């Protein structure tokens, strides 16, 4: 079962991506480096719940 998650920027801009994750293969919190257009840099995005 793939669950929807939100990837929030650690730069503090409030920018986020939404994606899906397979909880069986990745039980931990996801961290991925992606582009944040507000700061025009690649920063680490951390997993958060979609409310």
From Swiss-Prot:
UniProt keyword list: Ribonucleoprotein, Ribosomal protein
Signal sequence region: none
GO BP term, pick one: translation
Any single Gene Ontology cellular-component annotation: cytosolic large ribosomal subunit
Family matches, as Gene3D superfamilies: Ribosomal protein L33 (2.20.28.120)
GO molecular function, one term: structural constituent of ribosome
Pfam families: Ribosomal_L33
PROSITE patterns xref list: RIBOSOMAL_L33
Entry similarity comment: Belongs to the bacterial ribosomal protein bL33 family.
Entries under NCBIfam families matching the protein: PRK00595.1, rpmG_bact
Protein name: Large ribosomal subunit protein bL33
Phylogenetic lineage: Bacteria, Pseudomonadati, Pseudomonadota, Gammaproteobacteria, Moraxellales
Gene name tied to this protein: rpmG
